[in-house]
Design a protein with these regions (language model features):
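A ubiquitous short alpha-helical element
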Residues: 28-29
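PLD/PLD-like phosphodiesterase catalytic module centered on the HKD motif
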Residues: 2-7, 21-24, 33-210
């Protein structure tokens, strides 16, 4: 990015890593083990508050793994409040979707294919003013509370739309390589059925070349 504030934040972050001093206040970047966890928890609660107010709520996240207990509890609470949640979790996931009264508004899918997936994208509807964030952090205890990780906003509307379409909606539409996590912890492979087959990774290869 060429955004001056994010560049300044990155400079301050590396200064902190290479020296001693108090926790720094960054303008745009969220960083663990300091602000990332609390701010993302607040964003989940904000979606729940919108849902309780009858405004709906929507969360989409693409990560490699999920086992941090307070995040799982917050997602369960958001689901109970009426927030629709889609999680694209490539690997281990301790959350259980589709449990009545707990997580019936949460869907989890895993996609493993040709790509070594490492993009982490968090999307919040924010009452019709969507926020798109990219991060180095999975939703694990070690990433959010024990390591230095970063999370930064995609401010440019065109770039945010591209990330939403290619990294999120594209993968939510996959019906050939996706596996749906069930409430009992098992996975059920998606099938096209009457729909046209769609492979998220193949779509990107066809768009950008193999």
């Amino acid at each position: 990015t060429a955004e001056p504030e994010i560049g300044e934040d990155a400079h301050l972050l590396f200064m902190q890593l290479s020296g001693l001093g108090p926790v720094i206040n960054l303008k745009q970047i969220l960083h663990s083990p300091f602000t990332l966890h609390s701010q993302l928890m607040a964003k989940i609660e904000r979606e729940a508050a919108f849902a309780r107010a009858g405004k709906g709520g929507r969360i989409i996240a693409k990560i490699n793994a999920l086992n941090e207990s307070s995040v799982i509890s917050a997602l369960y609470a958001a689901s109970c409040a009426g927030v629709t949640i889609d999680l694209i979790v490539r690997g281990a996931c301790s959350l259980r979707p589709g449990i009545p009264g707990v997580s019936e508004n949460i869907r989890v899918r895993s996609i493993v294919g040709r790509f070594l997936e490492h993009s982490r994208v968090y999307w919040f509807n924010n009452d019709g003013n969507p926020e798109t964030w990219c991060s180095s952090a999975d939703w694990l205890y070690r990433n959010r509370l024990r390591r230095v990780e970063t999370c930064f906003p995609i401010r440019d509307p065109k770039l945010a739309s591209r990330v939403h379409e290619e990294a999120l909606q594209n993968y939510l539409s996959d019906n050939t390589q996706a596996w749906h996590l069930q409430a009992d912890g098992s996975y059920l492979r998606a099938t096209p059925g009457a729909q046209a087959p769609h492979c998220a990774q193949l779509a990107l290869l066809e768009k950008y070349g193999s």
